[in-house]
């Protein structure tokens, strides 16, 4: 794990957005037209999952977590800056978790395997081959599990406020049971006192408007029964054995004073993932808010990190090489054998050979000179910012 602490940039250097009104999903956001396309796909057990695609650029898949709503999130002062600013730079794919938002309220028997299966269903429905993953809060563990099981499809992993093990494994069983009981008792009551407990935990530095929106989202995004079942299921999550198998470069960020997921759980997560970068943010909010400096730091860090693969899935240079082919090409230029390249990228030797065949064809080289010519081209290509190699 590579750890560092980041201080907020001075105001003049922060990434900012001019506030504005929102007419709703597909309406005006910050003075610009926002359009998302909501579609449905069917999970293996028949549950219908709602997903949305917006923006353009390299694909970024935000793994689902509880309490989301594809339409309401656009109107929310808690989430709309996430959608706007990430969607400005990427083709942003997100989906409502089973039991939440526009997806079926039937949750079945939720588990890591089920949630990973839902993610598989969504990315296949969208038609993505290779993409970056964003896992926030409970979704971090699912992003880790997917990346470990599908190394050839994940280019980068960004995790915020996440954990590798649920409350059942971190000595917080009593807290979990108390919250589950409170959910069942007060989720839909007219009195907002119960929901205020949640907003105080998740958004301790939120404005009155942000906290009110979040409290309303709790009630509108899912039922009390589904919320309790999903919360309890998250407590049983444990991907500690899968995290060391993640091959994609990974950035882990965590708020220093997070009251929902203690910072030590974020550190543990980063420690378990080989060569992960860990950044501590100066915040107490489990959901980063637009007005706090930590949001600007988060956004700049995520873009710098994903920028190393910003052309993922797009043609690169006149040769039209994909990002994965460029990765193979750079390792060839470092003198690695096909077997070593396969080990570095978590691929089979046969897959590496197929990539090389495609590279040689695009570069119009062949024979013994092919490998040398390809390597020579590699050193001429613009190098992205490098992170420590595995």
Give short role names for the model-derived ranges:
Residues 129-171:
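Conserved hydrolase catalytic core segment
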Residues 160-216, 220-231:
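Helix-rich cap/lid subdomain of alpha/beta-hydrolase
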Residues 113-131:
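Conserved acidic catalytic loop of the alpha/beta-hydrolase fold
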Residues 276-316:
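Catalytic active-site module of serine/aspartate enzymes centered on a nucleophile-bearing elbow/loop
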Residues 361-390:
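Basic, Lys/Arg-enriched C-terminal extension of HTH/homeodomain DNA-binding domains
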Residues 308-330, 385-387:
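Regulatory hinge/linker segments at domain boundaries
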Residues 40-102:
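Conserved HGGG/HGGXW glycine-rich cap/lid loop of the alpha/beta-hydrolase fold
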Residues 246, 252-254, 258:
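Short beta-strand/loop motif that positions the catalytic acidic residue
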């Amino acid at each position: 794990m590579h750890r560092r602490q980041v201080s907020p940039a001075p105001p003049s250097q922060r990434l900012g957005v001019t506030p504005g009104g929102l007419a709703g999903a597909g309406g005006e956001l910050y003075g610009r037209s926002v359009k998302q396309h909501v579609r449905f796909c069917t999970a293996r057990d028949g549950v219908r999952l709602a997903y949305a695609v917006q923006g353009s650029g390299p694909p970024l898949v935000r793994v689902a977590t509880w309490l989301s709503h594809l339409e309401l999130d656009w109107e929310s002062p808690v989430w709309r800056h996430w959608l706007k600013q990430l969607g400005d730079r990427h083709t942003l794919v997100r989906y409502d978790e089973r039991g939440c938002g526009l997806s079926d309220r039937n949750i079945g028997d939720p588990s890591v395997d089920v949630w990973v299966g839902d993610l598989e269903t969504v990315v296949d429905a969208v038609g993505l081959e290779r993409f970056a993953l964003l896992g926030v809060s409970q979704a971090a563990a699912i992003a880790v599990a997917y990346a470990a099981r599908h190394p050839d499809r994940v280019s980068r992993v960004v995790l915020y406020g996440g954990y590798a093990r649920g409350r059942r494994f971190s000595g917080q069983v009593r807290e979990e049971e108390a919250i589950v009981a409170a959910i069942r008792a007060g989720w839909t009551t007219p009195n907002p006192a119960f929901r205020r407990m949640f907003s105080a935990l998740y958004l301790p530095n939120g404005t009155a408007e942000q906290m009110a929106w979040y409290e309303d989202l709790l009630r509108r995004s899912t039922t009390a029964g589904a919320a309790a079942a999903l919360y309890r299921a998250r407590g049983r999550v444990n991907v500690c054995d899968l995290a060391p198998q993640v091959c994609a470069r990974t950035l882990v960020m965590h708020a220093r004073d997070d009251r929902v997921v203690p910072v030590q759980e974020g550190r543990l997560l980063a420690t378990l993932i080989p060569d992960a970068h860990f950044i501590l943010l100066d915040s107490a909010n489990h959901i980063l808010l637009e007005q706090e400096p930590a949001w600007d730091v988060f956004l700049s860090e995520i873009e710098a990190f994903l920028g190393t693969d910003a052309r993922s899935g797009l043609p690169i240079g006149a040769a039209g090489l994909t990002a994965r082919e460029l990765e193979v090409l750079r390792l060839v230029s470092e003198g690695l054998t096909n077997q070593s390249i396969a080990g570095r990228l978590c691929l089979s030797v046969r897959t590496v050979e197929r990539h090389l065949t495609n590279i040689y064809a695009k570069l119009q080289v062949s024979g013994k000179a092919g490998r040398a010519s390809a390597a020579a081209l590699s050193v001429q290509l613009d190098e992205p910012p490098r992170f420590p190699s595995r």
